[in-house]
Regions:
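Well-ordered alpha-helical segments within folded domains of soluble proteins
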Residues: 88-92, 174, 237-243
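C-terminal substrate/ligand-recognition segments
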Residues: 164-174
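Hydrophobic, well-ordered secondary-structure elements that form the walls
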Residues: 173, 212, 239, 268
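Intrinsically disordered, low-complexity transcriptional activation domains
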Residues: 271-274, 278, 301-302
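TPR repeat positional signature
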Residues: 26, 85, 167-169, 235, ...
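Acidic, Ser/Thr-rich, low-complexity intrinsically disordered regions in fungal proteins
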Residues: 1-80, 94-116, 123-156, 176-196, ...
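Residues that mark the junctions of alpha-helical repeat units in TPR/alpha-solenoid scaffolds
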Residues: 22, 163-165, 231
Length: 302
């Protein structure tokens, strides 16, 4: 019944709560659901789209339940609030998860092809980015200028804003992750990576992984309490990119990557008490690999 549009007729507080309940369940499924779970069939019905004719308002398939009323952080009544923009970005994130799952099963069309899943997900991501209102964007929101008390007072806005920022950078980090294509090339003979794609994708992964570290620095500085394990997962994703660059021949990049890896791991440890999955990531072979790399570096210097 929750997925029937007729269930949400009316314009009262109870109806709004029903809408938020439905889309909250959808968002949870996009982030944490199994790829073959009960709610994990991501049809276009559930994909929110943007309308350019209405100042960037979110539109849905006529069969889908409407999004809840959301004006958090908006400067105009036609703009979607931060919660509603996050719903669409979560749908893109779920496509990224599916892409990685396909890669792990050797279901991978060369990512540089125009009809590849990589191209489709990247297109959805860029469309979403293009339609996010200016009021929610990093340069306009100026999170870095806000004091601790203001952030606590307006947590209803800043908590989803932070998650959207981490998600915004995690999506291209995963799509362009060096490990994804190194492993893919080893198991798929058709995946001969051209130098142009390899260079561009690895640079994009590093750029957005570095932005995740910047966001971590700001969260720590502003003493923002976070419990959602997605933040820890995003830190782990960024850490693996920095681990790759810990082997760089460029001394400055190598040093910066080691520093950023340590920041990601320290941040990830903060979620161990609330997430067993984050605890497993902290003690994963990749983290142990970094420790061995560090000991080898120290040995070579002595």
């Amino acid at each position: 019944m929750l997925d029937l549009k007729s269930f949400y007729e009316g314009d009262d507080q109870i109806t709004e709560r029903k809408k938020r309940l439905f889309w909250s369940l959808q968002v949870l499924e996009q982030f944490y659901g199994r790829q073959n779970g009960l709610l994990s069939v991501p049809t276009d019905i559930w994909q929110p789209r943007y309308s350019s004719r209405d100042g960037g308002q979110l539109e849905l398939n006529p069969k889908a339940p409407p999004l809840p009323r959301d004006e958090l952080g908006c400067t105009s009544p036609n703009e979607p609030g931060i919660w509603n923009t996050s719903v669409h970005l979560a749908w893109v994130w779920n496509q990224v998860r599916k892409y990685v799952s396909n890669c792990s099963h050797n279901i991978l069309k060369e990512p540089w092809r125009h009809d590849s899943m990589y191209a489709k997900v990247l297109s959805d991501f860029m469309e979403t980015e293009n339609m996010i209102p200016m009021c929610h964007r990093y340069d306009s929101a100026k999170f870095y200028k806000r004091n601790v008390e203001e952030l606590r007072r307006n947590r209803d806005y800043w908590a989803p804003w932070l998650k959207e920022q981490f998600m915004y950078h995690a999506i291209p980090t995963v799509l362009n992750h060096p490990f994804l294509y190194i492993v893919g090339a080893q198991h798929n003979p058709n995946l001969a990576i051209p130098n142009t794609f390899w260079k561009r994708s690895s640079e994009l992964a590093l750029l957005h992984a570095t932005w995740i570290v910047r966001m971590i620095d700001m969260v720590v500085e502003k003493e923002v309490p976070l419990a959602d394990p997605f933040f820890g997962y995003a830190a782990a994703i960024a850490a693996t990119v920095h681990l790759y660059y810990c082997c760089s021949a460029a001394p400055r990049l190598k040093h910066k990557s080691n520093t950023d890896f340590a920041k990601c791991r320290r941040f990830l440890k903060g979620f161990i008490s609330s997430s067993a999955a984050c605890g497993a990531l902290v003690s994963s072979p990749l983290c142990l690999t970094h420790e061995r790399l560090g000991s080898q570096t120290n040995t070579s210097r002595s």
